[in-house]
């Protein structure tokens, strides 16, 4: 509630207007004042902040309180009468002002109600005005339209003139319109009108019948036309369908032709890539053979030592051949780059053409065609990957050739050549063996001065081996190969061996020469020695030279070692090879050492063979298929024993990863037993000559063990020897010849990796037999 400022006129009488004030009367005051509430009010704050709410709360208590009985708290005297009068006057004024405020509020409410009623009436008037305006607009439009119609009729009347009159056909009277004419006929000519009406009805009936007949005829014609149209549309649809079928048939024929053409091109491209791949493989094998021939000139191995050519002309010739090989490799690389570029351009053009054709026929291509296109693309990508892999293989082989040639030149300068002469007497052979020991000491000293040579070529040879295996279809990380893969790789390996033999012109003659030499020496030594019989159950002692070690071709896999005695008819099949070092020209020859008998159920311990071994991977001419073939030649009853071998003091353990397995006596042919006896007699003869080895230099390795040392170590397992990476295919071919000569009766049972007996717990496959190099 708000307070209004009252003027003198407002206080003296009622406000102006029709509104009349209600009856006013002052109320009696009987309430006592609440001093505590009054004391809590801050008057200054209320005046400063215009706190009307506080005034509204206290207005009733102040206006209607009684102060007559109030006394002073200090002096206990009543209130001053004058002050009391002023307070009562103020209370009356406030009460009157409240009454005026109520009257004004009621007046304002009444006026607001009247205002709302006026506004509603005004709105209704505006709506009525709008409606009337719409009606006026419609009336005006109707009036305008009628005026136009009247003017049009007037013009027509003026134009027609007298012809617009209606004349009675029964009399001469004329009327303005047809209504008047009909009225005239009904009044004057009633009978004739009925006759005329009947005639008109009859005429109308005839016309109606005629129209019905025409309608029926028209409907019949329309139905015939519709039927003809349907037949025509059906014929057109049939023709369109026939054309679509023919077009689809032609498209299918064209599609089949294109598909056959595409497959033919893909087959041609595959055949081309395969021919190129074979050509490159043959060239690589030829280059590797030439490289090995160059290396064999600097290191030719035999039973008694290393044969070296001292002529400088040969070295110059080898250097020239190496340079020619490098030039051929450069020419081949350039040719391959050109061919690769042409193939890429051709494939890009074909791809663009196929993409355009695919975009044009994308709507009609079926799912099998899309699969065929994706398969062709995968074939193309696979062929491209093979080409890239072949290019990388060529680059790696070139780097290998350069590295090996550089190493060969350095080692040839450092290592003096030793010429082993063929002497028949035992004294000359002993002198040759002593010279060979001195040569080996020099080699070890050279390697000890530069031990980095041992580890320089390991990554290169590993990469070369991995790439060659991938080129043969064996992926990286494969733990083994199946029999089907072996059968698939056998023709390729056989072809490579034949190509290797053809590329090395002196291969057959050299093998025959070695066969004759070994046969003659064996016969001479056999004549001078007596055959020592072996007790039953004791296997014949074999030379460490006759142990052929298979090579590890995949990471973390180990293969069996085949120990085969040579036959008397073909001594070349067991031609021993010296343990080769990591580099060409660094050879080492070990003499056969007797192995003492150890009583056991079926085990034959082997004395630890001295010598150095090569990294556990095959050369370029011995792929994985040869490994499997060599493993299959081992007899079934074999219990190999292996023991960890101490490492040399100059880091030779990086390449010592092969183990040695001994062959137990079993059911074999008489030829094998006789050859074992022959080898045993040769061992005993050589053992007598090597009882006192030469003095070992400081830091050297004793390559020949004494017999008593062999007896002391009879219980320790032996490790396998291993073929070096620079050996030729002579051992492989000899082993293959031996496998063919064994025949169906003497052929040993293949011992696969997956069918090992349970007693092979201490086999070379066990992880505890020897610490292995990580990744090999």
UniProtKB/Swiss-Prot annotation:
Record bears the keyword Translocase: no
GO molecular function: zinc ion binding
PTM-bearing positions, type Phosphoserine: 425-426
Role noted for this protein: Involved in primary cilium formation. Probably acts as a transition zone protein required for localization of PKD1/PC1 and PKD2/PC2 to the ciliary membrane.
Coiled coil start-end: 196-450
Main location: cytoplasm
Positions with biased composition (Polar residues): 652-683, 709-721
One protein family per Pfam: Dzip-like_N
Extent of Low complexity compositional bias: 600-618
Similarity remark: Belongs to the DZIP C2H2-type zinc-finger protein family.
Zinc finger map (C2H2-type): 166-189
Chain residue ranges for the region called Disordered: 520-776
Species of provenance: Rattus norvegicus (Rat)
GO BP annotation list: ciliary transition zone assembly; cilium assembly; floor plate development; neural tube patterning; protein localization to cilium; protein localization to organelle; regulation of protein localization; smoothened signaling pathway
Subunit structure comment from the entry: Interacts with SEPTIN2.
InterPro entries to which the protein is assigned, alphabetical: DZIP1_N (IPR032714), DZIP_RILPL (IPR051241), Znf_C2H2_type (IPR013087)
Record keywords: Cell projection, Cilium, Coiled coil, Cytoplasm, Cytoskeleton, Metal-binding, Phosphoprotein, Zinc, Zinc-finger
Basic and acidic residues: bias regions: 685-694
Signal peptide range in chain numbering: none
Protein name: Cilium assembly protein DZIP1L
Any GO CC annotation of this UniProt entry: centriole
Compartment annotation: Cytoplasm, Cytoskeleton, Cilium basal body; Cytoplasm, Cytoskeleton, Microtubule organizing center, Centrosome, Centriole
Lineage, opening ranks: Eukaryota, Metazoa, Chordata, Craniata, Vertebrata
